[in-house]
Design a protein with these regions (language model features):
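Exposed substrate/partner-binding surface patches
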Residues: 1-37, 41, 75, 85-89, ...
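Papain-like cysteine protease catalytic cores
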Residues: 30, 71-210
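Active-site nucleophile-adjacent alpha helix/oxyanion-hole segment immediately C-terminal to the catalytic cysteine
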Residues: 38-82, 154-157, 161
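Conserved aromatic-histidine-acidic binding/catalytic patches
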Residues: 41, 45-46, 50, 56, ...
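Residue-level signal for mature regions of secreted extracellular proteins and peptides
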Residues: 46, 191-194, 252-255
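Hydrophobic alpha-helical scaffolding
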Residues: 48, 58, 97, 117, ...
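Carboxylate-rich, divalent-cation-coordinating active-site regions
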Residues: 53, 198, 283
Protein backbone atom coordinates (compact mmCIF):
# COMPACT_ATOMS: atom_id res chain seq x y z
CA UNK A 1 0.00 0.00 0.00
CA UNK A 2 1.06 3.65 -0.50
CA UNK A 3 2.12 5.67 2.53
CA UNK A 4 0.40 9.00 1.79
CA UNK A 5 1.64 10.59 4.99
CA UNK A 6 5.24 9.84 4.01
CA UNK A 7 4.77 11.30 0.50
CA UNK A 8 3.11 14.42 1.87
CA UNK A 9 5.96 14.96 4.31
CA UNK A 10 8.55 14.52 1.59
CA UNK A 11 6.70 17.00 -0.66
CA UNK A 12 6.54 19.57 2.09
CA UNK A 13 10.26 19.11 2.77
CA UNK A 14 11.15 19.56 -0.90
CA UNK A 15 9.03 22.71 -1.15
CA UNK A 16 10.60 24.06 2.02
CA UNK A 17 14.11 23.32 0.73
CA UNK A 18 13.26 24.99 -2.57
CA UNK A 19 11.87 27.99 -0.73
CA UNK A 20 14.93 28.15 1.51
CA UNK A 21 17.18 28.00 -1.55
CA UNK A 22 15.36 30.91 -3.19
CA UNK A 23 15.53 32.88 0.05
CA UNK A 24 19.27 32.20 0.33
CA UNK A 25 19.77 33.34 -3.27
CA UNK A 26 17.81 36.51 -2.53
CA UNK A 27 19.87 37.22 0.59
CA UNK A 28 23.10 36.54 -1.30
CA UNK A 29 22.14 38.98 -4.06
CA UNK A 30 21.13 41.57 -1.45
CA UNK A 31 24.48 41.19 0.35
CA UNK A 32 26.29 41.50 -2.99
CA UNK A 33 24.33 44.63 -3.91
CA UNK A 34 24.88 46.10 -0.45
CA UNK A 35 28.59 45.41 -0.78
CA UNK A 36 28.83 47.26 -4.08
CA UNK A 37 26.65 50.04 -2.74
CA UNK A 38 28.75 50.64 0.36
CA UNK A 39 32.19 49.54 -0.83
CA UNK A 40 34.99 52.01 -0.29
CA UNK A 41 37.18 53.11 -3.18
CA UNK A 42 40.94 52.77 -3.03
CA UNK A 43 41.13 56.45 -2.20
CA UNK A 44 40.89 57.73 1.36
CA UNK A 45 39.01 60.59 2.92
CA UNK A 46 40.66 63.85 4.03
CA UNK A 47 40.46 65.04 7.61
CA UNK A 48 38.97 68.47 8.22
CA UNK A 49 41.61 70.59 9.97
CA UNK A 50 39.10 73.31 10.85
CA UNK A 51 36.96 74.77 8.06
CA UNK A 52 39.22 73.16 5.45
CA UNK A 53 36.38 71.38 3.64
CA UNK A 54 36.85 73.81 0.70
CA UNK A 55 40.36 72.40 0.18
CA UNK A 56 39.29 68.79 0.69
CA UNK A 57 36.53 69.04 -1.92
CA UNK A 58 38.93 70.49 -4.51
CA UNK A 59 41.64 67.91 -3.78
CA UNK A 60 39.24 64.97 -4.04
CA UNK A 61 37.90 66.30 -7.34
CA UNK A 62 41.39 66.76 -8.81
CA UNK A 63 42.47 63.35 -7.53
CA UNK A 64 39.78 61.79 -9.72
CA UNK A 65 40.90 63.58 -12.90
CA UNK A 66 42.90 60.59 -14.11
CA UNK A 67 45.35 62.30 -16.46
CA UNK A 68 46.15 65.12 -14.04
CA UNK A 69 46.43 62.98 -10.91
CA UNK A 70 48.44 60.28 -12.70
CA UNK A 71 50.97 62.82 -13.92
CA UNK A 72 51.48 64.47 -10.52
CA UNK A 73 51.74 61.13 -8.68
CA UNK A 74 54.42 59.84 -11.06
CA UNK A 75 56.66 62.88 -10.76
CA UNK A 76 60.00 62.09 -9.08
CA UNK A 77 60.42 63.14 -5.47
CA UNK A 78 61.79 66.65 -5.15
CA UNK A 79 63.48 66.01 -1.81
CA UNK A 80 66.86 65.44 -3.43
CA UNK A 81 69.50 67.97 -2.41
CA UNK A 82 70.34 68.57 -6.08
CA UNK A 83 66.98 70.32 -6.44
CA UNK A 84 67.42 72.59 -3.43
CA UNK A 85 68.76 75.45 -5.55
CA UNK A 86 65.72 75.31 -7.81
CA UNK A 87 63.38 75.30 -4.82
CA UNK A 88 65.09 78.38 -3.35
CA UNK A 89 65.00 80.06 -6.78
CA UNK A 90 61.24 79.54 -7.04
CA UNK A 91 60.71 80.85 -3.50
CA UNK A 92 62.67 84.03 -4.25
CA UNK A 93 61.04 84.50 -7.64
CA UNK A 94 57.54 84.30 -6.15
CA UNK A 95 58.49 86.38 -3.07
CA UNK A 96 57.69 83.58 -0.64
CA UNK A 97 59.00 83.17 2.88
CA UNK A 98 62.34 81.92 1.59
CA UNK A 99 61.75 78.45 2.98
CA UNK A 100 62.40 75.45 0.77
CA UNK A 101 58.79 74.51 0.15
CA UNK A 102 57.13 73.38 -3.05
CA UNK A 103 53.41 73.00 -3.44
CA UNK A 104 53.78 70.45 -6.23
CA UNK A 105 55.85 68.16 -3.97
CA UNK A 106 53.34 68.24 -1.12
CA UNK A 107 50.48 67.72 -3.56
CA UNK A 108 52.30 64.73 -5.04
CA UNK A 109 52.73 63.15 -1.61
CA UNK A 110 49.09 63.83 -0.71
CA UNK A 111 47.77 62.26 -3.92
CA UNK A 112 49.99 59.21 -3.48
CA UNK A 113 48.75 58.78 0.11
CA UNK A 114 45.13 59.21 -0.99
CA UNK A 115 45.32 56.43 -3.55
CA UNK A 116 47.21 53.98 -1.36
CA UNK A 117 43.85 53.43 0.30
CA UNK A 118 45.43 51.96 3.43
CA UNK A 119 43.68 54.43 5.73
CA UNK A 120 40.07 55.50 6.01
CA UNK A 121 41.22 59.13 6.10
CA UNK A 122 44.53 60.95 5.92
CA UNK A 123 45.55 64.35 7.23
CA UNK A 124 46.43 67.02 4.61
CA UNK A 125 48.18 69.07 7.30
CA UNK A 126 51.57 69.18 5.53
CA UNK A 127 49.97 70.33 2.28
CA UNK A 128 47.86 72.93 4.07
CA UNK A 129 50.88 74.36 5.89
CA UNK A 130 52.66 74.79 2.55
CA UNK A 131 49.56 76.50 1.13
CA UNK A 132 49.68 78.91 4.08
CA UNK A 133 53.27 79.79 3.15
CA UNK A 134 52.91 80.14 -0.62
CA UNK A 135 49.37 81.61 -0.72
CA UNK A 136 49.08 83.81 2.41
CA UNK A 137 45.42 84.72 1.79
CA UNK A 138 44.43 81.18 2.82
CA UNK A 139 46.15 81.36 6.21
CA UNK A 140 43.98 80.62 9.21
CA UNK A 141 40.97 78.41 9.65
CA UNK A 142 38.23 80.57 8.15
CA UNK A 143 35.90 79.15 5.54
CA UNK A 144 37.20 79.96 2.05
CA UNK A 145 35.73 79.82 -1.43
CA UNK A 146 36.50 76.52 -3.18
CA UNK A 147 36.65 78.13 -6.62
CA UNK A 148 39.14 80.79 -5.52
CA UNK A 149 41.27 78.14 -3.85
CA UNK A 150 41.26 75.97 -6.97
CA UNK A 151 42.39 78.91 -9.13
CA UNK A 152 45.26 79.81 -6.77
CA UNK A 153 46.28 76.15 -6.53
CA UNK A 154 46.40 75.57 -10.29
CA UNK A 155 48.16 78.89 -10.97
CA UNK A 156 50.84 78.09 -8.39
CA UNK A 157 51.34 74.56 -9.73
CA UNK A 158 51.76 75.97 -13.24
CA UNK A 159 54.43 78.44 -12.06
CA UNK A 160 56.39 75.78 -10.15
CA UNK A 161 56.27 73.24 -12.97
CA UNK A 162 57.52 75.82 -15.47
CA UNK A 163 60.63 76.24 -13.30
CA UNK A 164 61.12 72.57 -12.43
CA UNK A 165 60.46 70.99 -15.80
CA UNK A 166 62.08 73.23 -18.43
CA UNK A 167 61.38 71.00 -21.40
CA UNK A 168 60.93 72.52 -24.86
CA UNK A 169 57.27 72.60 -25.81
CA UNK A 170 56.69 76.09 -27.14
CA UNK A 171 54.94 74.67 -30.20
CA UNK A 172 52.31 72.99 -28.06
CA UNK A 173 48.74 74.19 -28.64
CA UNK A 174 48.29 74.19 -24.85
CA UNK A 175 50.12 77.41 -24.08
CA UNK A 176 49.90 79.09 -20.71
CA UNK A 177 50.09 82.81 -19.89
CA UNK A 178 53.90 82.85 -20.11
CA UNK A 179 54.05 81.11 -23.50
CA UNK A 180 54.88 77.65 -22.14
CA UNK A 181 52.77 74.64 -21.32
CA UNK A 182 52.57 72.44 -18.24
CA UNK A 183 50.24 69.62 -17.27
CA UNK A 184 47.97 72.29 -15.75
CA UNK A 185 47.42 74.16 -19.00
CA UNK A 186 47.42 70.96 -21.07
CA UNK A 187 44.58 69.54 -18.97
CA UNK A 188 42.55 72.61 -17.96
CA UNK A 189 43.70 75.27 -20.43
CA UNK A 190 41.34 76.60 -23.09
CA UNK A 191 41.10 79.75 -25.18
CA UNK A 192 38.28 82.28 -25.35
CA UNK A 193 37.59 84.63 -28.23
CA UNK A 194 35.68 87.83 -27.52
CA UNK A 195 34.19 89.78 -30.40
CA UNK A 196 33.22 93.44 -29.94
CA UNK A 197 31.33 95.07 -32.81
CA UNK A 198 30.69 98.81 -33.17
CA UNK A 199 26.99 99.47 -33.79
CA UNK A 200 27.79 102.62 -35.79
CA UNK A 201 30.43 101.55 -38.32
CA UNK A 202 30.19 97.75 -37.79
CA UNK A 203 33.94 97.45 -37.26
CA UNK A 204 34.77 94.29 -35.31
CA UNK A 205 37.55 93.73 -32.80
CA UNK A 206 38.67 90.27 -31.65
CA UNK A 207 40.61 89.34 -28.55
CA UNK A 208 41.91 85.97 -27.33
CA UNK A 209 42.20 85.09 -23.64
CA UNK A 210 43.41 81.81 -22.07
CA UNK A 211 41.29 80.26 -19.32
CA UNK A 212 41.49 77.40 -16.82
CA UNK A 213 37.78 77.48 -16.01
CA UNK A 214 34.64 79.28 -17.14
CA UNK A 215 32.44 81.18 -14.67
CA UNK A 216 28.80 81.01 -15.74
CA UNK A 217 25.95 83.22 -14.59
CA UNK A 218 22.67 81.55 -13.68
CA UNK A 219 20.13 83.30 -15.99
CA UNK A 220 18.04 85.94 -14.21
CA UNK A 221 14.72 84.24 -14.98
CA UNK A 222 15.86 81.26 -12.87
CA UNK A 223 17.99 82.96 -10.20
CA UNK A 224 15.16 83.40 -7.67
CA UNK A 225 14.13 79.74 -7.76
CA UNK A 226 15.28 77.62 -4.85
CA UNK A 227 13.78 74.16 -5.20
CA UNK A 228 13.75 71.81 -8.17
CA UNK A 229 10.85 72.79 -10.49
CA UNK A 230 7.69 70.73 -10.49
CA UNK A 231 6.55 68.80 -13.55
CA UNK A 232 5.70 71.17 -16.39
CA UNK A 233 7.69 74.10 -15.00
CA UNK A 234 10.77 75.33 -16.92
CA UNK A 235 14.04 73.97 -15.55
CA UNK A 236 17.32 75.88 -15.51
CA UNK A 237 19.88 73.71 -17.27
CA UNK A 238 23.62 73.89 -17.72
CA UNK A 239 22.95 74.55 -21.41
CA UNK A 240 20.94 77.64 -20.40
CA UNK A 241 23.97 78.90 -18.47
CA UNK A 242 26.31 78.21 -21.41
CA UNK A 243 23.90 79.91 -23.82
CA UNK A 244 23.76 82.97 -21.55
CA UNK A 245 27.57 83.06 -21.43
CA UNK A 246 27.95 82.99 -25.23
CA UNK A 247 24.92 85.03 -26.29
CA UNK A 248 25.26 88.37 -28.08
CA UNK A 249 24.83 91.27 -25.65
CA UNK A 250 24.76 95.03 -26.05
CA UNK A 251 27.21 96.76 -23.75
CA UNK A 252 25.83 99.27 -21.27
CA UNK A 253 26.49 103.01 -21.50
CA UNK A 254 29.13 102.70 -18.78
CA UNK A 255 31.02 100.20 -20.99
CA UNK A 256 31.11 102.09 -24.29
CA UNK A 257 33.65 100.64 -26.72
CA UNK A 258 36.51 102.80 -28.00
CA UNK A 259 36.16 102.25 -31.76
CA UNK A 260 39.45 102.65 -33.65
CA UNK A 261 37.57 103.43 -36.82
CA UNK A 262 35.18 106.04 -35.38
CA UNK A 263 37.94 107.39 -33.09
CA UNK A 264 35.50 107.68 -30.19
CA UNK A 265 33.51 105.58 -27.74
CA UNK A 266 30.46 104.04 -29.35
CA UNK A 267 27.60 101.72 -28.54
CA UNK A 268 28.62 98.17 -29.31
CA UNK A 269 27.81 94.49 -28.92
CA UNK A 270 29.94 91.76 -27.40
CA UNK A 271 29.96 88.00 -27.83
CA UNK A 272 32.13 85.17 -26.47
CA UNK A 273 33.16 82.10 -28.41
CA UNK A 274 35.27 79.23 -27.12
CA UNK A 275 38.11 79.12 -29.61
CA UNK A 276 39.77 76.07 -28.07
CA UNK A 277 38.25 73.68 -25.56
CA UNK A 278 40.35 72.15 -22.77
CA UNK A 279 40.73 68.43 -22.12
CA UNK A 280 38.98 68.93 -18.78
CA UNK A 281 36.26 71.57 -18.93
CA UNK A 282 35.82 73.16 -15.51
CA UNK A 283 32.52 75.05 -15.21
CA UNK A 284 31.98 77.33 -12.21
CA UNK A 285 28.36 78.32 -11.53
CA UNK A 286 28.28 81.81 -10.01
CA UNK A 287 26.20 81.05 -6.92
CA UNK A 288 27.41 84.03 -4.88
CA UNK A 289 26.65 87.66 -5.69
CA UNK A 290 27.03 90.94 -3.87
CA UNK A 291 23.92 92.65 -2.53
CA UNK A 292 24.52 95.88 -0.60
CA UNK A 293 27.26 94.87 1.86
CA UNK A 294 27.09 91.07 1.81
CA UNK A 295 27.39 88.14 -0.54
CA UNK A 296 24.17 86.23 -1.12
CA UNK A 297 23.88 82.69 -2.40
CA UNK A 298 21.85 81.80 -5.50
CA UNK A 299 20.11 78.55 -4.55
CA UNK A 300 18.72 77.76 -8.02
CA UNK A 301 18.78 74.09 -8.97
CA UNK A 302 20.67 73.69 -12.27
CA UNK A 303 20.13 70.50 -14.23
CA UNK A 304 23.33 69.08 -15.74
CA UNK A 305 24.18 65.98 -17.81
CA UNK A 306 26.32 63.17 -16.43
CA UNK A 307 27.08 61.86 -19.91
CA UNK A 308 27.41 63.45 -23.33
CA UNK A 309 27.79 67.21 -22.81
CA UNK A 310 28.14 68.38 -26.43
CA UNK A 311 30.12 71.64 -26.66
CA UNK A 312 30.18 71.93 -30.46
CA UNK A 313 27.57 74.71 -30.40
CA UNK A 314 29.89 77.04 -28.48
CA UNK A 315 33.25 76.41 -30.12
CA UNK A 316 34.91 77.95 -33.17
CA UNK A 317 36.77 75.91 -35.74
CA UNK A 318 40.38 77.14 -35.55
CA UNK A 319 40.84 77.02 -39.31
CA UNK A 320 37.66 78.57 -40.64
CA UNK A 321 36.26 80.36 -37.57
CA UNK A 322 32.94 78.61 -37.96
CA UNK A 323 31.15 76.47 -35.47
CA UNK A 324 32.97 73.22 -34.89
CA UNK A 325 31.29 70.03 -35.99
CA UNK A 326 33.89 67.45 -35.04
CA UNK A 327 32.24 64.12 -34.42
CA UNK A 328 32.68 63.25 -30.75
CA UNK A 329 35.83 65.31 -30.18
CA UNK A 330 34.02 68.03 -28.23
CA UNK A 331 31.78 65.72 -26.22
CA UNK A 332 32.38 65.51 -22.46
CA UNK A 333 31.41 63.26 -19.55
CA UNK A 334 31.15 64.37 -15.94
CA UNK A 335 34.06 63.36 -13.69
CA UNK A 336 33.49 65.37 -10.50
CA UNK A 337 31.20 67.93 -8.86
CA UNK A 338 31.83 70.28 -5.94
CA UNK A 339 28.78 71.26 -3.88
CA UNK A 340 28.39 74.08 -1.36
CA UNK A 341 25.89 73.33 1.42
CA UNK A 342 24.52 76.29 3.38
CA UNK A 343 23.32 79.82 2.73
CA UNK A 344 26.39 82.02 3.19
CA UNK A 345 29.57 82.52 1.16
CA UNK A 346 31.73 82.60 4.29
CA UNK A 347 30.03 79.69 6.00
CA UNK A 348 28.45 76.36 5.16
CA UNK A 349 30.19 73.19 4.05
CA UNK A 350 31.79 71.80 0.88
CA UNK A 351 31.61 68.21 -0.34
CA UNK A 352 32.46 66.57 -3.65
CA UNK A 353 31.14 63.81 -5.87
CA UNK A 354 33.53 61.97 -8.20
CA UNK A 355 33.45 58.87 -10.35
CA UNK A 356 36.08 56.14 -10.33
CA UNK A 357 35.95 53.02 -12.52
CA UNK A 358 32.28 53.61 -13.26
CA UNK A 359 31.22 54.04 -9.61
CA UNK A 360 30.22 57.39 -8.11
CA UNK A 361 31.42 58.35 -4.62
CA UNK A 362 30.56 61.14 -2.22
CA UNK A 363 33.56 62.74 -0.49
CA UNK A 364 32.59 64.44 2.77
CA UNK A 365 35.92 65.18 4.46
CA UNK A 366 36.92 61.93 6.22
CA UNK A 367 33.89 60.01 4.99
CA UNK A 368 33.77 58.37 1.55
CA UNK A 369 30.57 56.59 0.51
CA UNK A 370 29.38 55.04 -2.73
CA UNK A 371 26.34 56.54 -4.44
CA UNK A 372 24.54 56.40 -7.78
CA UNK A 373 24.43 58.88 -10.66
CA UNK A 374 20.86 59.88 -9.79
CA UNK A 375 22.06 61.15 -6.40
CA UNK A 376 24.73 63.23 -8.12
CA UNK A 377 22.22 64.70 -10.57
CA UNK A 378 20.03 65.93 -7.69
CA UNK A 379 22.79 68.06 -6.12
CA UNK A 380 23.09 71.83 -6.47
CA UNK A 381 26.39 71.96 -8.31
CA UNK A 382 28.92 74.73 -7.67
CA UNK A 383 31.85 73.50 -9.78
CA UNK A 384 31.57 70.83 -12.49
CA UNK A 385 34.50 68.94 -14.03
CA UNK A 386 33.85 67.45 -17.47
CA UNK A 387 36.44 65.24 -19.20
CA UNK A 388 36.71 65.14 -22.99
CA UNK A 389 35.95 61.71 -24.42
CA UNK A 390 38.94 62.03 -26.74
CA UNK A 391 41.80 63.39 -24.63
CA UNK A 392 44.50 65.19 -26.61
CA UNK A 393 47.79 65.66 -24.77
CA UNK A 394 51.07 66.76 -26.39
CA UNK A 395 53.83 64.13 -26.48
CA UNK A 396 56.18 66.51 -24.69
CA UNK A 397 54.08 66.30 -21.52
CA UNK A 398 55.41 63.12 -20.02
CA UNK A 399 56.76 62.12 -16.63
CA UNK A 400 60.50 62.61 -16.39
CA UNK A 401 63.15 60.97 -14.29
CA UNK A 402 65.42 62.64 -11.75
CA UNK A 403 68.11 63.10 -14.42
CA UNK A 404 65.66 65.11 -16.52
CA UNK A 405 65.09 67.54 -13.67
CA UNK A 406 68.84 67.92 -13.36
CA UNK A 407 69.16 68.89 -17.02
CA UNK A 408 69.40 65.54 -18.88
CA UNK A 409 66.21 65.05 -20.86
CA UNK A 410 65.48 61.37 -20.43
CA UNK A 411 61.84 60.35 -20.86
CA UNK A 412 60.75 57.81 -18.30
CA UNK A 413 57.13 57.20 -19.15
CA UNK A 414 54.39 58.76 -21.25
CA UNK A 415 51.00 59.39 -19.73
CA UNK A 416 48.54 56.70 -20.71
CA UNK A 417 45.45 58.38 -22.11
Amino acid sequence: CVNHNHNDSRGKLERRLSSDSLENDRKHKKRKNDYHKHRRPRTSGLRNLGNTCFMNAVLQSLSNIQEFCGYIKQLPSLEDKVLKAKKIHISRKTRDTGEDVLLVEELRKTLVALWQGTKGAISPESLFSVIWKVVPRFRGYQQQDAHEFMRYLLDRLHIELLELLPYPNNNSPYIGPKGKSTIVTAIFGGLLQSEVSCLICRMESKKHDPFLDLSLDIPAQFSSRITKPKDGEPVCTLLDCLASFTELEELEDSELYMCNNCKQRQRSTKKFWIRRLPNVLCLHLKRFRWSMFCRLKVETFVEFPVKGLDMNTYVLNNLHETRGNFSGSNVYDLAAVIVHHGSGAGSGHYTAYATHEGQWYHFNDSTVTACDAETVMRCKAYILFYVRREIRLPDSLCVRTQSSLNGRHHLSRHLSV
